[in-house]
């Protein structure tokens, strides 16, 4: 395939805060397109109507733009193969699904959610992986027509071969073989008429002329489904490349519970986008020690997709901090540094809102750093002494911290009102007054017992920062409990 024909895409789902993993995959695709003189396309995959929101879509676009990733086609700029938002393409998919059914490769399934859940529970109890048991495969054409005409809710599933295996070549993993018995009869079209990710993904990649699909290794097991859909439609699949997942230092999967994973966390704390891209780009190149500081153009020059490792890319925040420091000191002139600081401050909602809250709580401007500096620190340096004024034992504080952490994860819209509501409910469940519950949280989030209002502060810090600070506080308090302090 000629380099000029290369077309790659990043296809995030707008269902939450933009993740550094999205930036990682997007950067690979961007560099791949640059290397081959191809096109980098942005597509919004919002088939999950219950979780996708315009607000999250805007955050995704803003985050990728902040990273310095420029796309040739997308929902904001259009292009020859739009629309670039799956919810705007709903009518495009159904004919492809109907073709699969008409050719005998798909079937209508009338199983209720309750019946499917009972099926899965029985399979789990028997020690089997849950997957569809094929009940509706045996329905006659007459019965299917009758139930469809009666308006009975149903989905469309794909048929899977009953024996043998799917063999394919992956750009990273090489030759892969997955037995068909491990592949589920995937839903292609949901009862509401929206396609599932798998169906929309294949159709969109075909219509948008995507030549290479580079995504996380978690999608490797889905390739047999996608190859089957291509075959059922008589289409040529793209080249697949499945990238190793980013991992924590202990080799566990990068998780928001262990490290801040939202791009907004790094923007708010003043990391440079060039440094973050530099850090992520090092996973895709081979360099000698001392050559780590690279611009986007230099990353593109050194980019080599032929030598990707299957080992997990370690997300080492200390290395990111080191790179960010070097970018600030070595890559920015004094004028550029001043301009970056001013731009960061002027565009920083956390700073603006923090100043509003501080105005009625200080008598001199010089008091501001002590009162609001916690909003911008990546590490509070929390020590046991910070909890000295809390009227609770270390064991009681630890119980509070460990209880509220999962409770806060339940919040759908992160704002001070929902935070207060959830913490009041937590206090009630623990049989404690709200004041007793928020006392250790106050220290955990701000590092001090004198600071800005807790609920406002938690909203400004954001979910990922609060999660990280509560985790650190629990570790500090646990050490106090263990030492008898």
Curated annotation (Swiss-Prot):
It catalyses: tRNA(Glu) + L-glutamate + ATP = L-glutamyl-tRNA(Glu) + AMP + diphosphate. It is an enzyme of class 6 (ligase). ATP binds at residue 256. Pfam families: Anticodon_2, tRNA-synt_1c. A motif ('HIGH' region) lies at residues 12-22. It comes from the Bacteria. Signal peptide: none annotated. GO terms for molecular function: ATP binding; glutamate-tRNA ligase activity; tRNA binding; zinc ion binding. A motif ('KMSKS' region) lies at residues 253-257. Gene3D superfamilies: 1.10.10.350, HUPs (3.40.50.620). One of its GO terms (biological process) is glutamyl-tRNA aminoacylation. SUPFAM superfamilies: An anticodon-binding domain of class I aminoacyl-tRNA synthetases, Nucleotidylyl transferase. Its EC number is 6.1.1.17. InterPro entries: aa-tRNA-synth_I_cd-bd, aa-tRNA-synth_I_codon-bd_sub2, aa-tRNA-synth_I_CS, aa_tRNA-synth_I_cd-bd_sf, Glu-tRNA-ligase_bac/mito, Glu/Gln-tRNA-synth, Glu/Gln-tRNA-synth_Ib_cat-dom, GluQ/Sye. Transmembrane segments: none annotated. Keywords: Aminoacyl-tRNA synthetase, ATP-binding, Cytoplasm, Ligase, Nucleotide-binding, Protein biosynthesis. It is found in: Cytoplasm. GO terms for cellular component: cytosol. The keyword Cytoplasm applies. Coiled coil: none annotated. Catalyzes the attachment of glutamate to tRNA(Glu) in a two-step reaction: glutamate is first activated by ATP to form Glu-AMP and then transferred to the acceptor end of tRNA(Glu). Belongs to the class-I aminoacyl-tRNA synthetase family. Glutamate--tRNA ligase type 1 subfamily. Monomer. This is Glutamate--tRNA ligase.
